[in-house]
A protein has these predicted regions:
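A short, Trp-centered hydrophobic/proline-enriched beta-strand micro-motif
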Residues: 113-124, 464-472, 516
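Amphipathic, small/basic residue-rich leader segments at the start of a protein or domain
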Residues: 1-87, 344-436, 446, 456, ...
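Glycine-rich beta->alpha junctions and the first turn(s) of the following alpha-helix
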Residues: 2-14, 52, 79-80, 175-268, ...
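A short core secondary-structure module
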Residues: 120, 136, 140-180, 498-544
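A structural signal for short hydrophobic beta-strand segments in well-ordered beta-sheet cores
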Residues: 127-134, 486-488
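C-terminal helix-coil-helix/basic helical segment that borders enzyme active sites and/or dimer interfaces
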Residues: 25-35, 237, 241, 245-248, ...
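Alpha-helix capping/hinge segments and adjacent helical runs
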Residues: 51, 297-385, 407, 411, ...
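N-terminal glycine-rich flavin-associated loop
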Residues: 85-102, 433-452
Length: 730
């Protein structure tokens, strides 16, 4: 999924993508690798006619009047096309000037495309004041390896003066510019020298703080980087579909499939971070430094890793000068250099998260929703005024437990109403029944159950009076549910079921279970399966708890020996249970992917641990990565929710939901691994009332999180096959 998620941003992205495909196809890129870059590049006027140079600049200077998020959408498409020339450096430089003064005179030239700008992250420039009133600055020094410096007529450079570091705008004809060989020939670089250049105070961008400047630079460069990463992911996946080895497409091999899926996960995570950082800048948010640091931690690394993996997927041909991977790898490496030292960004993530705090992951709803909010708030207040018993019944009967369900079981709540309900119950401190695994089973009963089944099971489940378990996995059929062997034989009035289930959560506490059994052994693998509602008190059921790594007993083996289940407890059609179970599994994955797990330390808890500890630079670097990754996983869920709110196709929200589940569980494991590794010999303490023992418990428990609800490996297959379109296993 690209940065753009609203219809307007998608239209902008499509327009830019069309331009880039027309003006910078592969043959143009390779020709530019061998020749001197023309200035301005051939596409410059076409881009100006679309208003791209000024998309983020004020209308008063001829710009489009949009924001940094819109510019990020544009730059991501330029990254996807590895467009040669100074467009990206010029856009960043103009954003820096505009942050100082939206009506600065030079911006009109930059918006129209009649001028080109460049900038530097840091420099060796110093300035001293001269004149009777010290009104003049004399600048001396050198700035090394400045992208597009030789193509620019205006340069934005940091200068050390008495009051600290400031940004100045200099004309190219005031400077000595020495072009040098660039690692990326499509983006030339040059050393820049100032030999006693005298400027007035009007050249100083006094309203541009270092925090804002860095946020703009890192966010916009990150936008280009995620475009590069997306190209690498798409290109590797496309090649894996057509390249054959050993008689089948290489994309069918799990090693390649997982590599491509990891590339997509890397790209989506970084994209979410860039999107949020751009929003933070446009909002003038106080946590913009944190958001930009998260983007800078994730995006350039994603671009570099994804292109490296793209080369690997292509094999030898990917290591040739003529292949496009050569162009994109060089762009990824140059971009990484433009971010400065890589360790600085995760350190900034740690510093901001542990001091001013992380950026909130919230949804801002339209003002039109306030009337609905007032109505729901009043209903929640009425519920709060009730005694506990009547309140529980009223919440169940009012459809508040799973409000997205159709009436009378839910409230037929759309996405906006669901969000408001969750917010108001939290704000009003009114607890809804926690129905646990039933939240995965109830949607199937609503969709496929008879009226008698709905009346029998749904009201008490919503009240919390029935506790459910899910009897799907078997010793020989874990993630491969279609391989189950539990057998159901038809008898007078129902079925006799024999088999064994394993990893059944909370079976020892459950009154009822959702059971899959094979009713037609001669049918194809996914057919001949029936979905049963099983009374866990039935004769012939034996539940044996499994003691886990933690010593706790949450999972169970369930032995089913000739258990009778009446026909009235068949859910859906006989032999069509796979269809019913897929509805349950979909509900399960959405739930797991969009909520914190009780097995893991939360991100705020990890940040608190880092804030209270003493760590060396290497550990700080790792902690910053973990915080950035955890925050971005939450952003993936936010983007998925916003896509749902926008009413677009459901499959557009799938990448964020599926990838968030994969990444959140890994990150949770990472929190615990980091903490335990920091305790030294105290990590051996097993007393969970002490901090080392508590985190040791988290570490032990976290190993389950990449297994339950679909193993990480199965999740990677799902991402590769359903989202990238790689061929399924034969």
């Amino acid at each position: 999924m690209p940065i753009a998620i609203t219809p307007e941003h998608q239209d902008l992205a499509n327009s830019v993508r069309s331009l880039v495909a027309r003006v910078a196809p592969s043959e143009v890129l390779h020709e530019a690798m061998e020749t001197q870059v023309t200035n301005p590049p051939p596409y410059w006027q076409a881009a100006a006619e679309q208003g791209l140079q000024g998309v983020h600049l004020a209308e008063s200077v001829g710009g489009q009047g949009f924001g940094i998020l819109e510019l990020a959408v544009v730059l991501a498409e330029f990254g996807y096309g590895a467009v040669p020339g100074p467009f990206v450096p010029s856009a960043v430089a103009s954003a820096l000037i505009s942050a100082h003064d939206t009506d600065a005179k030079v911006l009109a030239e930059l918006a129209s495309g009649s001028a080109i700008a460049a900038y530097a992250l840091d420099s060796g420039l110093t300035a001293t004041r001269h004149g009777p009133r010290e009104e003049a600055l004399v600048i001396r020094g050198e700035v090394r390896a400045v992208p597009a410096a030789a193509q620019a007529s205006v340069l934005v450079l940091p200068v050390a003066i008495d009051s600290g570091e400031e940004w100045v705008v200099l004309r190219a004809d005031q400077l000595e510019i020495e072009p040098i060989a660039s690692l990326d020939p499509l983006r030339p670089i040059a050393h820049v020298r100032a030999n006693a250049v005298e400027v007035g105070d009007d050249a100083v961008l006094t309203n541009l703080s270092m925090t804002t400047a860095h946020a703009l630079m890192f966010t916009l460069l990150s936008a280009e980087a995620v475009g590069v990463a997306r190209w690498a992911t798409d290109t590797a996946s496309a090649y894996a579909k057509i390249r054959e080895q050993f008689g089948r497409p290489i994309g069918q091999f799990q090693a390649i499939k997982h590599k491509c899926a990891e590339m997509m996960a890397d790209t989506e995570r970084a994209t979410a971070a860039v999107w949020d950082a751009a929003r933070a800048i446009d909002e003038a948010s106080p946590d913009v430094e944190f958001a930009a640091a998260v983007a800078a931690t994730l995006a350039p690394a994603a671009a570099q890793r994804c292109v490296q993996d793209c080369i690997q997927v292509h094999g030898g041909i990917g290591f040739t000068w003529e292949h496009d991977t050569n162009v994109y790898y060089r762009r990824a490496l140059l971009l990484a250099a433009c971010f400065g030292r890589a360790s600085e960004h995760p350190q900034r993530v740690v510093d901001t998260a542990t001091s001013t705090g992380m950026r909130a992951v919230d949804i801002d709803l339209d003002p039109e929703s306030e009337k609905l909010r007032a109505e729901i708030r009043a209903e929640v207040a009425a519920l709060k005024a009730m005694d506990r018993g009547p309140r529980k019944v009223a919440i169940a009967e009012g459809g508040w437990v799973l409000p997205y369900l159709p009436r009378p079981w839910g409230r037929a709540a759309g996405p906006v109403e669901q969000i408001i309900i969750a917010q108001e119950f939290t704000t009003g401190r009114v607890k809804r029944p926690q129905i646990a695994i039933a939240a995965w089973i109830v949607p199937s009963i609503v969709a496929f159950g008879t009226e008698e089944q709905k009346q029998r099971f749904l009201p008490p489940t919503f009240r919390g009076d029935i506790f459910w378990c899910q009897l799907f996995s078997e010793p020989g059929a874990g993630s491969d549910l279609a391989g189950l062997t539990t057998k159901a034989t038809r008898v007078d009035g129902g079925w006799r079921i024999t088999g064994q289930k394993i990893w059944t959560t909370a079976a020892q506490y459950s009154q009822w279970g959702a059971l899959l059994a094979r009713t037609d052994p001669n049918a194809p693998k996914h057919n001949g399966i029936t979905y049963f509602l099983l009374d866990m008190k039935s004769a012939g059921i034996q539940v044996k708890p499994l003691r886990e790594l933690t010593g706790h007993e949450m999972f169970n083996t369930v032995y089913i020996d000739d258990v009778f289940v009446p026909d009235e407890y068949v859910l859906g059609e006989v032999n069509r249970g796979w269809e019913v179970s897929r509805n349950t599994l979909t509900a399960e994955r959405v739930t797991i992917g969009s909520s914190d797990s009780n097995f893991l330390a939360t991100l705020p808890e990890f940040v608190e641990f880092v804030r209270d500890g003493q760590f060396d630079q290497v550990a700080q670097h790792r902690a910053g990565h973990l915080i950035a990754e955890g925050h971005a996983a939450k952003l993936l869920n936010l983007r998925s929710t916003l896509l749902t709110l926008a009413g677009g196709p459901k499959d557009r929200a799938m990448p964020s939901a599926a990838i968030s589940k994969l990444l959140s569980m890994r990150t949770g494991q990472g929190y615990a691994e980091f903490a335990v590794s920091s305790f030294g010999t105290d990590a051996a303490i097993g007393d969970t009332d002490q901090l080392p023992g508590k985190w040791g418990e988290y570490l032990l428990a976290s190993r389950a999180t990449t297994i339950y609800g679909g193993t990480s490996e199965v999740q990677l297959n799902i991402i590769a096959e359903r989202l990238l379109g790689l061929p399924r296993d034969p």
